[in-house]
Structures are given as structure tokens and as C-alpha cells.
Design a protein with these regions (language model features):
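Short alpha-helical segments enriched in small residues
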Residues: 4-165
């Protein structure tokens, strides 16, 4: 299973880098539940310096508030794993990066920490590109923590590829 994910990462991330180079676009990430894996996958490819601008791991609520200026009231009312928080993360990332494409990721990797309303495997992926901004919600069930992170990273890559093409 690890080899399959590795192959997917390398193939899809290389496709993404080539597409971004071709279109002369830069990308930045604000990660929470993926813990820097997204940025790591991109920068493990040769040529990534031409397209990768910024990678932030804002794992704690405090980091989200301090670095990405996510309002305390958003986290208190909706939680760090919410559409509202993800939207705030991607919007504010776009203000501090030098990128055309900005992506935010927040979720519950597990194996603990989930609730009935927000189960383990829940993830929100925010994307801002040109005038478009959206947040997608996914639920990846019955996955280990690392597999959840890998599936999330692959979903981000596929999402960016589909939006930029």
C-alpha cells in the first residue's frame, strides 16, 4: 500500500509541477492535519522551486490564529475543523504568499479526536485561484493516520490539477 501511495504522489505531484511551470504559476499551502506532508511531496520533486512559494504548518489553534489570522470567534463557534476555518485559512494565506494558487487543509487524522458531528477522517480542503475560492469537504473512513494524510495529499493534488487545467 505504501508503494502505491508513493507512486501516486510522485506521478501526480510531477504532473502538477509540470503544469504549474507551463502556466507560470506559484502555489502555497497552509496545512494542519497533513503536518507538512503536502509541502514535502511537492518539494521532493526536482524543479519545485520554480512553482512552490510557501508551506505553513499551522497545526494548533494558536498557530492558525497567530500566523493565518483566523479569528478566535471562528474557531470558538465552528471549530478548527470547519468550512469557516478552512476558508479563513486560505483567504489569509493568499494575503501573505506570493502565489497564484493557495491551498488550506484542516481535518481530523485520528485515531482519536473525532465526534459524531466531526468524525475521524473528516477533512476540509480550501483552494483560492484567481477569483475562484471554494472549500471541499471529504470523509475518508477507516484509514490509519498516515494513510489519511496520504489520501488527503493526493486529493489536494488532483483538485489543483482539475482547477488549473
Amino acid at each position: 500500500l505504501y508503494c502505491i501511495y508513493l507512486l501516486l504522489f510522485m506521478t501526480n505531484s510531477k504532473k502538477l509541477i509540470n503544469l504549474l511551470k507551463k502556466k507560470k504559476l506559484k502555489i502555497s499551502f497552509a496545512e494542519s492535519c497533513t503536518g507538512g506532508l503536502m509541502s514535502s511531496v511537492i518539494t521532493s520533486n526536482s524543479g519545485s522551486s520554480k512553482v512552490f512559494d510557501l508551506g505553513l504548518v499551522t497545526y494548533s489553534n494558536q498557530a492558525k490564529q497567530k500566523i493565518l489570522r483566523v479569528p478566535n470567534k471562528v474557531i470558538k463557534k465552528y471549530g478548527a475543523v470547519s468550512v469557516q476555518c478552512c476558508l479563513s485559512m486560505v483567504n489569509n494565506l493568499s494575503k501573505i504568499s506570493n502565489s497564484h494558487i493557495n491551498v488550506s487543509i484542516t481535518g481530523i487524522a485520528g485515531p482519536k479526536g473525532g465526534t459524531r458531528k466531526k468524525p475521524v477522517g473528516l477533512v476540509f480542503i480550501g483552494l483560492k485561484f484567481k477569483k475562484k475560492i471554494f472549500v471541499n469537504k471529504y470523509l475518508f473512513k477507516n484509514k490509519s493516520r498516515i494513510n489519511f494524510q496520504k489520501i488527503t495529499v493526493n486529493k489536494v493534488i488532483k483538485t489543483v490539477l482539475s482547477v488549473v487545467k
